[in-house]
C-alpha cells in the first residue's frame, strides 16, 4: 500500500506536469518535426482514440510493443494533440521508463517528471516491484492512463517477443480490475531491429485495439495468463502489419 507521502508526490507531479503540458508537448513536437517524423493517418488514429475515451470511466492501461527509446513519445503524439491533453488531463498518459534511461542527467530527469514518468528499476528487488505496482494501481484507480511495455524492454529480435514477457502487466490488471486495456502497435516502416532512435524522416504505422482480457486463474497463473493474452493481441496486430501494409521493407 502506498504511503500518503508517495500518493501526494504523484498528485503534485500530475498537477505540475498538467500545468506545463502545452510547453512540454509542443517543444517535443518541434523536435519530432525537426527529425521529420510523420504518422500518415494521424487524424484517424486520434479520432479512434477519442471515441474510445468518450466511453471510458475507469483507468486505462495502454499496452504497446517496444523497439526504440522514444516509443512512448510517438504513442502520445499519435493519440492526441497537445491542446486536447490540456483540456482532458486523463488523456495525458503516465509512463514507466527504465530509471537508468531517465536519470542520465538533470535535463532528462526534469523532462521525465514533466512527462509524467514514474521511473522503474528493471529486475529490481521485490519490494521495488511492489512499490511500482502499487503506484500503477493508485493511478488507474483515479481514472488515469498508464503506458506499459509488456516485454519489459526493447525487443532484441525486432518483433514482439513472447519470450521476454514480464508478468507485471497482468499483476497491474489484477490490482485494478476495473481498468480498460488498449493495445497499441507502433512501428517505423523502415525499422528492421531495435535501436535508440528511429531514423530521420521515419514514417510510423500506428494501430489501436481495445482489448478485454479475462482469466479464470488466480495469483501468479492469472498474472501470466493476462500478460500472455495481451502480448498475443500485440503479435496479431504485428502480423497484420506485415501481411497487409504496403511497406518499404
What are these regions (language model features)?
Residues 1-93, 104-116:
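Membrane-anchoring hydrophobic helices of lipid-metabolizing enzymes
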Residues 205, 211-213, 221-242, 246:
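A conserved mid-domain beta-alpha-beta active-site/ligand-binding segment of alpha/beta enzyme cores
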Residues 118-159:
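Internal catalytic-core helix/loop-beta-alpha segment
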Residues 7, 106-109, 145, 152, ...:
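A cross-family acyltransferase "interaction/gating" segment
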Residues 58-64, 143-150, 179:
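Generic beta-sheet signal
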Residues 42, 125-130, 162-163, 223:
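A conditional alpha-helix N-cap/helix-loop micro-motif detector
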Residues 90-102, 122-123:
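A short, structured active-site edge motif that brings together acidic residues
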Residues 96, 118, 180-184:
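Hydrophobic/aromatic beta-strand patches that form the interior of the parallel beta-sheet core
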Amino acid at each position: 500500500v502506498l504511503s500518503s507521502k508517495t500518493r501526494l508526490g504523484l498528485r503534485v507531479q500530475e498537477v505540475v506536469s498538467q500545468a506545463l503540458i502545452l510547453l512540454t508537448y509542443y517543444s517535443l513536437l518541434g523536435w519530432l518535426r525537426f527529425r521529420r517524423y510523420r504518422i500518415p493517418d494521424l487524424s484517424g488514429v486520434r479520432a479512434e482514440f477519442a471515441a474510445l475515451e468518450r466511453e471510458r470511466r475507469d483507468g486505462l492501461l495502454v499496452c504497446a510493443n517496444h523497439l526504440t527509446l522514444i516509443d512512448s513519445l510517438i504513442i502520445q503524439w499519435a493519440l492526441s494533440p497537445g491542446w486536447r491533453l490540456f483540456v482532458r488531463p486523463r488523456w495525458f498518459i503516465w509512463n514507466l521508463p527504465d530509471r537508468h534511461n531517465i536519470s542520465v542527467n538533470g535535463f532528462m530527469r526534469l523532462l521525465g517528471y514533466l512527462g509524467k514518468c514514474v521511473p522503474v528499476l528493471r529486475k529490481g528487488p521485490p519490494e521495488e516491484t511492489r512499490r511500482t505496482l502499487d503506484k500503477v494501481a493508485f493511478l488507474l484507480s483515479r481514472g488515469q492512463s498508464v503506458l506499459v511495455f509488456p516485454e519489459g524492454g526493447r525487443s532484441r529480435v525486432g518483433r514482439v517477443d513472447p519470450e521476454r514477457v514480464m508478468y507485471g502487466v497482468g499483476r497491474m490488471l489484477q490490482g485494478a480490475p476495473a481498468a480498460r486495456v488498449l493495445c497499441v502497435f507502433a512501428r517505423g516502416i523502415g525499422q528492421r531491429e531495435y535501436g535508440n532512435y528511429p531514423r530521420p524522416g521515419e514514417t510510423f504505422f500506428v494501430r489501436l485495439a481495445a482489448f478485454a482480457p479475462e482469466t479464470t486463474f488466480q495469483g501468479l497463473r492469472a498474472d501470466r495468463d493476462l500478460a500472455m493474452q495481451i502480448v498475443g493481441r500485440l503479435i496479431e496486430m504485428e502480423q497484420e502489419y506485415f501481411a497487409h501494409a504496403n511497406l518499404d521493407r
